[in-house]
Amino acid sequence: MPTSSRSHRRAADISRRQLLAGASAGAAALFLERGGLHAQAPAGSTVVFSHTTVVNVDAVQNDVALAVEGDKIAAIGPTDQILQRYPRAEVYDGRGKALFPGLVNCHAHLAATLERGFNEDFGFPNSAKLSVRPGSLLQGEEATLMVTIGALEALRTGTTTIVENTGGIARSAAALAKTGLRCVFAESVRDSENVPGPMSPEGLTKSETPKFSAKLRDEGLQRIDELFSKWHGANQGRITVFPAAALAETASPELLKAVRAFAEKHDLGYTIHLSQSMAEVDFMVRHHGLRPPAFLDKHGFLGPRLFAAHCRYVNDADIALLGKSRTIVSHQAAMAANRGVIPPIPALRAAGCPIANGTDNNTNDLFEVMRVALLTERIRRDDPFPGVRPQPEDALEDATMGGARAVRQEKLVGSLEVGKKADLLVLDTQRAHLEPAGRIVSAWIHNGQASDIESSMVDGQFIMRNRKVLTMDEAGIIAEADRVGKRIWGQVEAAGPVAIPGRTRRR
């Protein structure tokens, strides 16, 4: 692991001549102290991360350099050789740092940031009996503000690619594009007139045979087409658009076929929420005579282009269908645990389902999700000798290459390889909770913090550098979100009593 003569040192530019001269550690430390912060590298320039550690799932290279030229990784190798190859490059001192692939968040609802600190404690679907929904009180551009602060959290915590899965993405698309994140806009549609979703136990008792509307279906498909026409491939290819059916319980066979057809026509992936509650499963059996995966299979929706969100309540037959079809599962480990559920990821993986991960609601910290995924899968496995499978490298793979496969960009992102996009994280390893460490991947996932991330790049451009976000007004966004949140929650409380669970145990 690379070392540094001073903890928490700000990265500074070092000339090629000084590095090649083999300056002593003391001289290097003095130079670093006198150096200033990096300026943002201009588009198309070359940046060399020197004397650093390059981390991939299957290999960790110590004391090497990684060169970024334009938007791609151009070279990885010994620092002196890389600097000789790129004599005009800007040099980012990598001593005491490790480069990780950027994380790929395959399932997010960024606007739900509004309800964090409340939504997490009422089960799923939310059982709180509020007189008014907080989201209905947003005014003007405030919904976009909630999306933006969610994206800000995602950026700070290591995400470089994010799938925003909701309806009406056009309203916040421009703001998301400006964050610098690689985005997949999964425009979500439904065509049921009389099925509220997601299904709840209360909704199930009142449910009736679904009625589907061609008008709703056509409007939703038009939204997908318009979003695709305007945004797919925008911002030098950073933005892609996928179609999405919202929920199994709100989708007709015709909608499912149309979503898949759109994806196949344009060589895209597509997504849906699947088997996320027992109420959903019971609804589908009651009104369609099939469990959710079987319903999707009957209508040709399963397959390797599909990444299904959740799959918490699946039985052996469901798992067999998903595995046989090579459907990808994005399981949102932290939110599942929050709901008191551990999805059967070992069985899904064994059946043939590629696995990815996401954040879902309220929180957008995929780094924390990696750790929860590792620990909850160890519990779910119930191995005779526990605590060995999965390994931290498995959790990292699901959050990087697993996500890249789900969004059909595995040839572009998900690992640090020559020719791939320069989507990467710079981790400061000189931290009390990371040193000493036998394995950097294990140390970070078990003991690390998102704040260990010093800088991040997307498309070869820094979107955060030396812990300063470069693409958004962080302080302004936080202050405005605080103001709006206080107003809205004040209105919620004024509209009627809010039953807060509070402490559930008494002596």
What are these regions (language model features)?
Residues K298-R305, P346-R431, N447-A450:
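His/Asp/Glu-enriched, well-ordered alpha-helical/loop segment
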Residues P2-V64, V68-K72, T79, R85, ...:
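Active-site microenvironment of metallo-dependent hydrolases
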Residues A174-R312:
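Metal-coordinating catalytic core of metallo-dependent amide/deamination hydrolases
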Residues L114-L145, L152, E187-K215, M278-R305, ...:
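Active-site gating loops and adjacent loop-to-helix segments of metal-dependent hydrolytic enzymes
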